[in-house]
Amino acid sequence: MTRKYFGTDGIRGTVGQSPITPDFALRLAHAVGRVLRRTQERPTVLIGKDTRISGYMLESALESGFNSAGVDVVLLGPLPTPGVAYLTRAQRASLGVVISASHNPYPDNGIKFFSAQGTKLPDAWEEEVEAALEQPPVWADSASLGKTRRLDDAAGRYIEFCKSTFANDLTLRGLKIVVDAAHGAAYHIAPKVFHELGAEVMAIGCAPDGLNINHQVGATHPDALVRAVRANHADYGIALDGDADRVQMVDAAGRLFNGDELLYVMVAARLARDEHVPGVVGTLMTNMAVEEALQRRGVKFMRAKVGDRYVLEELQRQHWLLGGEGSGHLLALDRHTTGDGLISALQVLQACVRSGKTLAQLLADVPLFPQVLLNVRLNPGQDWKTNPVLADAIRDAEAELGAHGRVLVRASGTEPLLRVMVEAREAEQANRCAQRMADAARAG
């Protein structure tokens, strides 16, 4: 069944345009509430959000929709996406709801859901919700309407959970760390986590005004972090995105490390302690150098579709624990049920502290292949798959690269973009092939 509203990470779009409107949010919550009440007499849902100004409007609409279906609501306020996932499980709630468009700019927003176990929900559940949306509302009678309360210590509970994933015998004392929260959901949480574990913390991107989320800061704009690390002679820099489910890191020299590299560090740290790591899941975008390095160490590697939900599904199928994406969505299922930027950063810092090595030293044997990613904006209704010029360009690039590189062309699941990725042993070759395909896509 083709889904009408749900994409790869919930429902997302521009505020004020369908489906990100208050009336749709109310109808959506009512439909979700009806689905929940098919199996539960009195469901409870948690609602968290990032710092976009539109979050207030959507939060109120969702609250009303759930209450009208006989569902109780607990408001968490601004909280990272993984914090909502954790509290949904810890509070024994029926469902977790996040109002966020992650790394997108403030005019966008979105709505996504977590199961009672704190995991992303399957496509089948989303299809059930979409079917319920097509039915007329059935309002609960007055005696059965839901109620709403606020969990005032939600942030503090999540901070303690994050700290609990860091080894008790280690400390961050003596380290200077720059933390960039992208003016997003972790603005009041991330600096405290690292400070309470002993680090000297300098915070940037921690002054949200409702309009500046992800603006020239955070994991998708790491230049600000690189400058701050160098200017303050810090040991590390940590950049989160707007909802803090992804992370990028910087070392004292200002070198940026992406999710592929951080995932390898997490795996290598476990191998160094003789922990069994049977396999790791990446995506179609994961750098070939990481795959080869893991295989040299006897660790199986599998590629899932792009999107942390698909990495999670493959991990569950294989009964493995570790996976992630180059974008910084990293999963360690014995630490958390979903990708968590803060916990991932703590796992990497733990590896550095325990080994006494820097990130560059831990990754000395894993030089990444040059990888070029170009985004081509698609016109409404444009079908890139039927573009013969692009098809020829893809075939030519694959023939030129052979076994020494990769080509991936795919539509974004969250934006009207065509993503063109080329990986090769030489940067010039990767750039040339990627540009040819991007030009062909624009010509179509």
Swiss-Prot record:
The keyword Isomerase applies. It catalyses: alpha-D-glucosamine 1-phosphate = D-glucosamine 6-phosphate. SUPFAM superfamilies: Phosphoglucomutase, C-terminal domain, Phosphoglucomutase, first 3 domains. Pfam families: PGM_PMM_I (PF02878), PGM_PMM_II (PF02879), PGM_PMM_III (PF02880), PGM_PMM_IV (PF00408). The active site is at residue 102. Activated by phosphorylation. GO terms for molecular function: magnesium ion binding; phosphoglucosamine mutase activity; phosphomannomutase activity. Gene3D superfamilies: Alpha-D-Glucose-1,6-Bisphosphate, subunit A, domain 3, Alpha-D-phosphohexomutase, C-terminal domain. This is Phosphoglucosamine mutase. It comes from Acidovorax sp. (strain JS42).
